[in-house]
């Protein structure tokens, strides 16, 4: 057999998804069309890969770091002309298909130890988004991270990540995934989320995006403090009070209580007054 004798490796954070119902929900969320080119991150033994190849997608390209799994995947899908495989670290290898074309959608069971860097690679940052956004990403993440991504203002898990991701994309829950859905089962619960990146014309303009990033870094360094204190280094008290009054926000609030739209308006207010330069 292609994967005979291969066991999940802790250093690669390997947990095989074996729940057929979850695999079906992932595929449904991807909404695969005949002209889609799919990028799969961390295919493992190919359970999801098999489902993707059974869809109408024109191509499926997978990136796998584990050399032994690469060998097994090549054997398992040797007769699939629409399948291509890249061995290497998804954080550094090219993510284009074998023929150089970009993928249209990403479907992945992401290794939990690289979630943050991989999200940035796939989506970019507010001030440096990817040039060609994917139509959608269906990602299996640790539940805690998924909750932060889709959190609402005022919730305990609302963070700078919540603001950034919600200004880059629309994020919705697909389904919860308990530990028993994996082999071996992880110690944490997981969740499948759907991320639909905003079109380039819907993104923040570069200067405004840079200023939002600067404000988020400043404010969320001390998320328990009131805005009056966290933004004290950004503006003198008098100007800060005037801007808050103009925007209708209270400086008694804490960073996690402001919506993404309010952070944008706060940054826009600074832009209009030209009161502070964003960090480089």
From Swiss-Prot:
**Which residues bind S-adenosyl-L-methionine per the record?**
15, 17, 42, 64, 89, 109
| Transmembrane spans | none
Subcellular location(s) per record: Cytoplasm
Any Pfam family from its record, for instance, is: RrnaAD
Concerning SUPFAM superfamilies, the annotation shows: S-adenosyl-L-methionine-dependent methyltransferases
Q: Which UniProt keywords apply?
A: Cytoplasm, Methyltransferase, RNA-binding, rRNA processing, S-adenosyl-L-methionine, Transferase
Looking up CDD domains in the UniProt record yields: AdoMet_MTases (cd02440)
Q: What is its EC number?
A: 2.1.1.182
Lineage top rank: taxon: Bacteria
Please give the GO cellular component terms listed in this UniProt entry: cytosol
UniProt xrefs under InterPro entries: KsgA/Erm, rRNA_Ade_diMease-like_C, rRNA_Ade_Mease_Trfase_CS, rRNA_Ade_methylase_Trfase_N, rRNA_adenine_dimethylase, SAM-dependent_MTases_sf
What would you give as a GO molecular function for this chain, any one? 16S rRNA (adenine(1518)-N(6)/adenine(1519)-N(6))-dimethyltransferase activity
Catalyses: adenosine(1518)/adenosine(1519) in 16S rRNA + 4 S-adenosyl-L-methionine = N(6)-dimethyladenosine(1518)/N(6)-dimethyladenosine(1519) in 16S rRNA + 4 S-adenosyl-L-homocysteine + 4 H(+)
NCBIfam families, per the entry:
ksgA (TIGR00755)
Q: Which family does it belong to?
A: Belongs to the class I-like SAM-binding methyltransferase superfamily. rRNA adenine N(6)-methyltransferase family. RsmA subfamily.
- Describe the task this protein carries out: Specifically dimethylates two adjacent adenosines (A1518 and A1519) in the loop of a conserved hairpin near the 3'-end of 16S rRNA in the 30S particle. May play a critical role in biogenesis of 30S subunits.
Q: What's the protein called, per UniProt?
A: Ribosomal RNA small subunit methyltransferase A
